[in-house]
């Protein structure tokens, strides 16, 4: 995700903070929590580093390329302002930051909200103004008003060999279901039309709580993936499930999708298709069972959109194993796919595996993957031509707007160019007749008015 520099209306005596958020949606939610606390204490947010009293940079440390981006952002903040507090995933390895930028004021790790606030207080004491507008009940959101990320847990208890998330964020810690639902309800009442459910491992939600129930309204709701998804589906907003590890119980969510409670969309990171590669990754490794499950899912939910992510060039990946992956893309007909060339990450067990793949081979396989996936995506989208789709409008244009179908998440998936005879509104859900399809995007005309 691109860096996000926040802004709010100035207040005469309030200290001004510039805030940069890097990385994934989970990090963006962390940023929202910090910003909400800062606003509640009277701090103002500004777009420019130069006009701020302090800069906070929420970093990403998952890949070396992300670390480089984080270090660059810190350097820019130091050059333009000079007073910088660093937090986020890269903050778990402070020596790397200090080596490049020894003058940062403080470094904290992910989810260390109190430590961030303490560092801000020390550098720029708050000047609380009792006449400031109250912070909204749903908190300060960094997304457009019509959609919001809903984080249901922190950390991950899996031990994939390519990943260091458990070392950065710890094991799975789920939020009580009642807490999640109250936040979701506040968001919907504030105008949010789409809830994007996120975590490091969404389908493991509640395992650490032993699926304990907690109160919500006049009933008790279990901290269980299926129960939570069903309750969220009763709030009247689109509910989109992200980062769903392919456990067997995920099959049951198809009933909620078929009933219209949850969007027919599943973001499920398969990572590869070759059983031998998956074994080295310490991921579920039965391609035959996975294909059979996908067929069953699509039989139950014909309009299901599958998004996934894959890694090419994993240590030891042979040409035959890579060909298995390409064949899986074709046979499974994955609608949307992200692809990453394997990068050694300090602290990852995969670094010790034999037979690293040369960078040139990684690049060549990445290109072949993307060409194959583009064909699959184009074929899947072409089937939508002539159909009517519900489209949520993200941007208004002179001749209509740009939006997304139920099969498209913001920022990572495709869009729909919508032509309309009347002005559209951001957040509106329009019925659109699809008239053309490309490799990733659609276009059509709004109908019904």
Swiss-Prot record:
PROSITE patterns, A to Z: MTTASE_N (PS51449), MTTASE_RADICAL (PS01278), RADICAL_SAM (PS51918), TRAM (PS50926)
Keyword set includes Metal-binding: yes
Residue ranges occupied by any TRAM domain in the UniProt entry: 382-448
Location(s) in or outside the cell: Cytoplasm
Binding site for [4Fe-4S] cluster 1: 24, 60, 89
One GO molecular-function entry: aspartic acid methylthiotransferase activity
Function according to Swiss-Prot or TrEMBL: Catalyzes the methylthiolation of an aspartic acid residue of ribosomal protein uS12.
Protein name: Ribosomal protein uS12 methylthiotransferase RimO
């Amino acid at each position: 995700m691109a860096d996000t520099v926040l802004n709010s209306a100035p207040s005469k005596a309030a200290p001004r903070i510039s805030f940069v958020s890097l990385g994934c949606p989970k990090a963006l939610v962390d940023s929202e929590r910090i910003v909400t606390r800062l606003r509640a204490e009277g701090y103002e947010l500004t777009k420019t580093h130069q006009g701020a009293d302090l800069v906070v940079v929420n970093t990403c440390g998952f890949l070396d390329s992300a670390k480089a981006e984080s270090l660059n952002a810190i350097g820019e903040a130091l050059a333009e302002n000079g007073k910088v507090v660093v937090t986020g995933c890269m903050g778990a390895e402070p020596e790397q930051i200090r080596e490049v930028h020894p003058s940062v004021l403080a470094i904290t790790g992910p989810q260390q909200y109190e430590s961030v606030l303490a560092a801000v207080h020390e550098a720029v004491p708050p000047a609380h103004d009792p006449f400031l507008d109250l912070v909204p009940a749903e908190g300060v959101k960094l997304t457009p008003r019509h959609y919001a990320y809903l984080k249901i847990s922190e950390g991950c208890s899996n031990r994939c060999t390519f990943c260091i998330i458990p070392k950065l964020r710890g094991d799975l810690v789920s939020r009580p279901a009642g807490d999640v639902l109250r936040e979701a309800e506040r968001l919907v009442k504030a105008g949010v039309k789409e809830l994007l459910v996120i975590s490091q491992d969404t389908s493991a939600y509640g395992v650490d709580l032993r699926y304990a129930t907690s109160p919500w309204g006049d009933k008790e709701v279990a901290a269980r993936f299926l129960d939570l998804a069903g309750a969220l589906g009763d709030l009247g907003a689109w509910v989109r499930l992200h980062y769903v590890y392919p456990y067997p119980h995920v099959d049951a969510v198809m009933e909620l999708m078929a009933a219209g409670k949850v969007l027919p969309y599943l973001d499920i990171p398969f990572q590869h298709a070759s059983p031998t590669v998956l074994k080295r990754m310490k991921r579920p490794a039965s391609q035959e069972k996975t294909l059979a499950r996908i067929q069953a899912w699509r039989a139950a939910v014909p309009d299901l959109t599958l998004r996934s992510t894959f890694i090419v060039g994993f240590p030891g990946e042979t040409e035959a194993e890579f060909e298995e992956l390409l064949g899986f893309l074709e046979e499974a007909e994955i609608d949307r796919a992200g692809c990453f060339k394997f990068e050694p990450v300090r602290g990852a067990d995969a670094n010790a595996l034999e037979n690293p793949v040369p960078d040139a081979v990684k690049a060549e396989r990445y290109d072949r993957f993307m060409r194959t996936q583009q064909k699959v995506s184009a074929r899947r989208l072409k089937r939508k031509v002539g159909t009517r789709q519900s489209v949520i409008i993200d941007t208004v244009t002179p001749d209509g707007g740009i939006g997304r179908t139920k099969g498209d998440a913001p920022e990572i998936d495709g869009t729909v160019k919508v032509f309309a005879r009347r002005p559209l509104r951001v957040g509106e859900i329009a019925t659109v007749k699809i008239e053309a399809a490309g490799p990733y995007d659609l276009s059509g005309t709004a109908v019904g008015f």
